[in-house]
Amino acid sequence: MKTWAIGAMALGLALPAHGNDTTATVGVGGLQFAQNENVRMLSEDLYLSMDEVRVTYEFENLTDTDQHVLIAFPMPDIESSPYEMAGFPTDDPENVFGFSTTFDGQPVEAELHQSAFALGVDRTKELQKLGVPLAPHLLSTEDAINALPDADQQVLVNIGALGAHPYEDASGYHSPAWTLKSAYLWDAVFPAGEIVEVHHRYTPGLGGTVAATFVDTEYGQRAEYEEKYCLEDNLVAAVERTLTSPDEPWSAPFTEAWLTYILSSGANWAHSIGTFRLTVDKGSEDNFVSFCGEGVTKTGPTTFEMVQEDFYPWQDIEVLFVVRREDY
């Protein structure tokens, strides 16, 4: 895959997760993604920004009989970390991302399926038995944990679901240590030989930092970013030119925001994706964005597009937004 990075035209440069529809089964141990050879994804039109994710699909039933399919749309994993910024659009534990969908123009009531994993083991039942909410990022969840009897807290510690609170002045407190995995499910009927359109939208949950960490060569994550986001030297150099103190790599007037889109689940349908179109919007001309792709073109002041035919979504999309701070 060709690497490339997109910068801000204002700085003189020429041209840095959520998921695909998939079929599913619900079995012992939770949601399982299944292969479907009877329905093909003809096209996918995906729009990614810091404010909104939109995706429109066209599906074709390749058979002469109606296909009844359980569709799943996996959302990004949610963790609770005191060391990284993570922005969640709402405090609604049942619809954190404000997800909505239509099937052939009609609204769909999707069912949310959630599981809590600690040390790779599904611990949903243990948490629910104790009345602990599954959303690890909410303060109400932490309050519920620390209201439990010590014996119950110790049970959760023993199975890896709780960790010590990271701040010294909170000695004796615990924080969630599990990962919440979520997917929206609904039953769909694909009419024999016909094409239907499916549309989703939601507000992404973004991770991030308070600085452009990749500029710091001693403690930064340059190598990781080069692999994950295809970060290139011209973007790094542009950010370095904005340093208010040349010897202080954290003095650049930028923050980071990270977006993950689960694209690989789209490989569960018959054949490849006929036409895949990706649009990434960096939000402001003063921002930068970096990610991996091929044949990208600039389509507007802040938008960039990639179009691929017979596309196989073997890996997910990782986007790095380098955001100019408003106070500079």
Predicted features along the sequence, with ranges:
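N-terminal signal peptide c-region/cleavage motif recognized by signal peptidases
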Residues: 14-16
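Lumenal/extracellular ectodomains and adaptor appendage modules
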Residues: 18-328
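Sec-dependent signal peptide recognition
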Residues: 2-8
